[in-house]
Amino acid sequence: AITTYIFPLLRITSVFVLAATSWAFAAIKKPIVNSTSKKDLKYFRTLHSLAFTELGMKKSNVMQDEHYEDIGRKLGIEVTVYSNGEEKTGFVDSDSEYFNIINAARIKGITIEEEYNTDMYSQDIDKHMLQILKDEVDNYKYSYKLVDFTDMIEKFNVAELCPKYDVIFVDEAQDLSPIQWKMYDILKKNSKHVILAGDDDQAIYGWAGADVARFQSEPAKDIILPQSYRIPGAVQDIANCILNRIPDHRRIKKQWSPRPEKGYVEYVTSIEDLPLYS
């Protein structure tokens, strides 16, 4: 996909390549970094990075792990945040369901109560503490003039500070959350051409608010890439065993060929047998 679609686009002076998360961005940037000039790489961003830049923000404006932990201490909520000040999924990566519920609600554009009622969380949550925590977070950010990653997208969507582009290319679009889809709509309005790259079968960020249904229903000319250069046959067989159980109305059916080599799949019966730290 990169060779077929992105490299030709680099000849256009006004093209922006965007990714839903920093992990997706790293994957798309790697094969390109040696094939283009450094000045062109400024056109390769995550959605959060684009919002951050267009809003004229500085890193000192961004909520860090210690800020969330400070708020937790004030309210007697034990929390550890693992982002190291970097956006990976657009989601606050913490061990606190309180922070996760609040952020998920904002990303999805729903109320805290609606997110709480999704049955994704434990029964130990004090429902009344959720609003108290949200108010404390808002007050903390206001007092210290800080923003979080969700604020960046929200502020971009309100201000619509979007340059004009000939083409935007959005990678891993199946992982866009409702708030990111709103940002995409603004980008689309300010671009002559839009390419969405993604695969609903690879949607793994539902827990972080990914709106796969929006990706599936987006009006566009569908192009199914017929050949994978990454997946061997044995892995495709396992994947198809799972995917074929999904009702037709829940996914986009597609035909594609795996790599020539068959490969192999190992079955591991215990997590203790996985070399997680090697």
Predicted feature residues:
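Short active-site oxyanion
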Residues: 13-16, 41
